[in-house]
Amino acid sequence: MGTTKVTPYLIFATSVAAIGSFQFGYNTGVINAPEMIIRDFLNYTLDEKLDEPPSRLLLTNLWSLSVAIFSVGGMIGSFSVGLFNRFGRRNSMLIVNLLAVIGGCLMGFCKISESVEMLILGRLVIGVFCGLCTGFVPMYIGEISPTALRGAFGTLNQLGIVIGILVAQIFGLEIILGSEVLWPVLLGFTIIPAILQSAALPFCPESPRFLLINKKEEDEAKQILQRLWGTQDVAQDIQEMKEESARMAQEKQVTVLELFRAPSYRQPIIISIVLQLSQQLSGINAVFYYSTGIFKDAGVKEPIYATIGAGVVNTIFTIVSVFLVERAGRRTLHLIGLGGMALCSVLMTVSLLLKDKYDTMSLVCIAAILIYVAFFEIGPGPIPWFIVAELFSQGPRPAAMAVAGCSNWTSNFLVGLLFPSAAYYLGAYVFVIFAVFLVAFFIFTFFKVPETRGRTFEDITRAFEGQAAEANKLGKGPTMEMNSIQPIETTTHV
């Protein structure tokens, strides 16, 4: 493999793709700040249409539906990433922006139309769009990035998400767009990134792996690689893709069921699912969904600004992980993140229990939340998204991304649905549940998750196939030793 460079073209292409991640983050966080204003809109609109004032239960259920329908749309969208093989990586991202525009228009005009249905339908449509983005973006970035930089560029997916959440928190302030007059603009803002990405995508390359392996366009794939990576010596990478293409020609199309049936796919798909669960069941979204209330319970006078502070920490440590992931490796960072979050979860529980007795415990709670967020962005935040693309070859990758994405969205939905009840009955002890999950995921990662830093897609696939073949001979399930994949030496210039 030749010397690769971080070229402006590579930065441009990955940044444009990451706008889809920004959309996911923005639409995840945008609904929280104007909650009371939207509840008033639901009350007023239904009061005008119904013969009698809407009940408190009906209003609560409609609000919950407005929030949760986003995750339902995400589940649907995540299982539709098969579009990637039909239309190509770049064109698929371009096409689905139509959903962002439709969803944004529905939400943006729901107030002037006095339509609760438009708000809920808009959240569903934008959820489908974001579900597609959670599959499209990490796959595209992984396929256009050099092996030596795949982890660093893969982290840009998570960076886009956290920047989106932070922008939503800031725009949601009452002095900006979170007011009774401008909240539809806050929800409809998602149209602008969609238009910007649609304008920029035609100037981005198609995935060279898709061109060579799926379309058999070797010359064009070679030219794109040379321009993206800033080197003429891409012969080894082209040869690796051709070998993978030959293997694909001998295999039948990989379905979701085949991922669980075939021994060579079973181990990596289980790892992919568990890593996605480790992200959501870590409790991060519970902390962000209800961070304002948590800070308020901890004694913070202006909790909304403390929540934004947590968003800033979120963004800073995502940037830190960009520089760490190719040095420390995926597995190591994930373990550090899980372990640190488990300790912080226990610390949050203790500090919330003792805050009324000791004033300093409020500061301890705030510090625990901020450190918890920092550990999340070191490992469980960015790594599960792009490591799925690394564990599979070109054939099963879209199906694997669909399964992993659906696992993430489903667990996200369940946490959002169940956390309020759990917090009501358990109080501060609710974070002990997340601590137990984090310890379990730490143990799984330590024994089952391989290091993929510096390895080609083909190398990783062969390692799993070798393990599966050996396991079949021994008559037991396939396993992957934690050190069975070691990084190769590469030269990279910035």
From Swiss-Prot:
CDD domains: MFS_GLUT_Class1. The modification Phosphoserine is found at S484. Residues 33-64, 111-117, 174-182, 290-303, 352-362, 420-428 are extracellular. Glycans are attached at N43. InterPro entries: Glc_transpt_3, GLUT, MFS_dom, MFS_sugar_transport-like, MFS_trans_sf, Sugar/inositol_transpt, Sugar_transporter_CS. Residues 276-278 are annotated as: Important for selectivity against fructose. Pfam families: Sugar_tr. It catalyses: D-glucose(out) = D-glucose(in); D-galactose(in) = D-galactose(out). GO terms for biological process: D-glucose import; D-glucose transmembrane transport; dehydroascorbic acid transport; galactose transmembrane transport. Keywords: Cell membrane, Cell projection, Glycoprotein, Membrane, Phosphoprotein, Sugar transport, Transmembrane, Transmembrane helix, Transport. Detected in stomach, placenta, lung and brain. Belongs to the major facilitator superfamily. Sugar transporter (TC 2.A.1.1) family. Glucose transporter subfamily. This is Solute carrier family 2, facilitated glucose transporter member 3. The gene is SLC2A3.
